[in-house]
Swiss-Prot record:
Species name: Staphylococcus epidermidis (strain ATCC 35984 / DSM 28319 / BCRC 17069 / CCUG 31568 / BM 3577 / RP62A)
Gene: rny
Pfam family, one: HD
Protein's recorded name: Ribonuclease Y
HAMAP family assigned: RNase_Y (MF_00335)
Functional summary from the UniProt entry: Endoribonuclease that initiates mRNA decay.
Cross-referenced SUPFAM superfamilies: Eukaryotic type KH-domain (KH-domain type I), HD-domain/PDEase-like
InterPro entries assigned: HD/PDEase_dom, HD_domain, HDIG_dom, KH_dom, KH_dom_type_1, KH_dom_type_1_sf, Ribonuclease_Y, RNase_Y_N
Keyword set includes GTP-binding: no
Keywords of this entry: Cell membrane, Endonuclease, Hydrolase, Membrane, Nuclease, RNA-binding, Transmembrane, Transmembrane helix, Virulence
Membrane topology according to the record: Single-pass membrane protein
Family of this protein: Belongs to the RNase Y family.
Amino acid sequence: MNLLSLLLILLGIILGVVVGYIVARNLLHQKQVQARQTADDIVSYANKEADNIKKEKLLEAKEENQILKEQAENELRERRGELQRQETRLLQKEENLDRKSDLLDKKDEILEQKESKLEERQQQVDAKESSVQTLIMKHEQELERISGLTQEEAVKEQLQRVEEELSQDIAILVKEKEKEAKEKVDKTAKELLATTVQRLAAEHTTESTVSVVNLPNDEMKGRIIGREGRNIRTLETLTGIDLIIDDTPEAVILSGFDPIRREIARTALVNLVSDGRIHPGRIEDMVEKARKEVDDIIRDAGEQATFEINVHNMHPDLVKILGRLNYRTSYGQNVLKHSIEVAHLSGMLAAELGEDVTLAKRAGLLHDVGKAIDHEVEGSHVEIGVELAKKYNENNIIINAIHSHHGDVEPTSIISILVAAADALSAARPGARKETLENYIRRLERLETLSESYDGVEKAFAIQAGREIRVVVSPEEIDDLKSYRLARDIKNQIEEELQYPGHIKVTVVRETRAIEYAK
C-alpha cells in the first residue's frame, strides 16, 4: 500500500467521522426538539386537566352550597310557618277571649236593665196592691151599710148559695170520672204491677282489675323481662297492661282496668310461656293471635246470651257488640250478666201482664248495649244504644225501651216501663254493684280519652293504676321536638281538667321501624 492510498483512507475516515458527527448532532437536535415538544404537550394537557378538575370542584362546591342553602331556607321557612301558626292560634284565643269578655259585659248590662225593670214593676205591683186593698175595704164597708149584714154573715150566705149551685155539677163530674177510671183500669193495673215485682235470683261475680298467669318456674320471669327489659316493655306497649313481676313464686300479675286488654295480654302471655320463644317479634305475633282468640270468645258470649234468652234473628254484628258487654262492668256489676238478668225479669213481668214476652226479653237484653262501645264513640250509652238499635233495624218498641230506661224520654209502651223497672231492680239488688271500682275505671278512661284527643296520637294506655299515661304517636306526624311539646300539653290539660291523687307521669313513645325482606 502506497502513501496515497493511506491518505485516501485517512481522509475517508475523517470525512466519515465528520459526517457521522453532523448526522448525530442533527438527530440529537431533532430528539431535543421532539422532547421539548412532548414536554410542552404534557404540560399543556396537565394544565387543561387541572382547569377541568378545578371547574368540576367549583361546580360541586356551588351545588353543595346551593343544597345547604335550600335546606337552611326550608328549615327557616318551616320554623317561620310554625311561628306564624302559633301566632295565629294565640290571636284566635285572644279574639275568643275578647268576644267572651264582650258577651259577659253585654250580659251584665242586660241583667242590670232587667233588674231595674223588675224593681220598677215591683213598685208598680206594690202600688196597685195597695190601691186594690183600699178599694176592697171601701166595697165591704158599702155592702155592710146597704145590706145591714156583717162581713161574716155576708160571706156565709154567699157560700151557701155557691154550694147549692155547684152540687149538681159536682155529681155530674163524679159520674164522668168514674166512667173514665173504669176505662183505664186495665192500663193502671199493669203500671202498678210493673212496680211490684220479685227479685230474680242470679249470681254475679265482682270483676277485679288483675289477672294472674302461672309460670312453670321462676327462671321464666327473667325471660319475660328480656334483655334490658325489652320483652316486658314490648308486651306492655302492645296491650296497654302493666306486668307486675315481684317475689310471688311462679306467677306474674297482669294489672289493667280494661278487661278486654287484660284478657288479650293474659292469653298472649300464656301462649308465649307455652311456646318458650319470647322475643319482641314473637310477642307481636302472639298478641295478634290473642286478639283474634278474644274476638272469638266475645262472639261466643254474645251468641250464648241470645241462646239463653231465646232471642233469634239478631244481626251478627249486634251479637258481637253484645258479647263485648261480658268484659264491661257498671259499678262492679258484669254488664252482660246484668243485661241477661234484666231480660229474664222483663220477660216474667211481660208474661204476668199479658204483653209480648219475646219482645220484652229482647228489649231487656239490649237496653245497655251502648256500654259496649261508649268508650270508643261520643255520647252517652243510651244515645249510642239507640243508634245501634236503629242501625240494625230493631223494633221501635225496643228503641224506645233503650231510650227511656234512664228517663231521658217518656216511655211509649208497657214494655219500656217493664225494662226500666227490671233495670232498677237488678241494679238495686244487694251486692250487685260497687261504686269505687266504677269511679276508678271512669277516671282511667277519661285519662286515655283526653290523651287520644290530640292529632298524631295513635293510642294511649293508662298504666300503673293511673299513675302513668303512655301515649304512642305516629312518627310521620310527630317529630322529636313535637313529642316534648305534646307531653307538656297533655300534662297541662290533665292538671286543668282532672282530679287525681299524687302525680301522673306522661310518657310519649315515638318509634320508627324499617322492614325489608331478603328473598
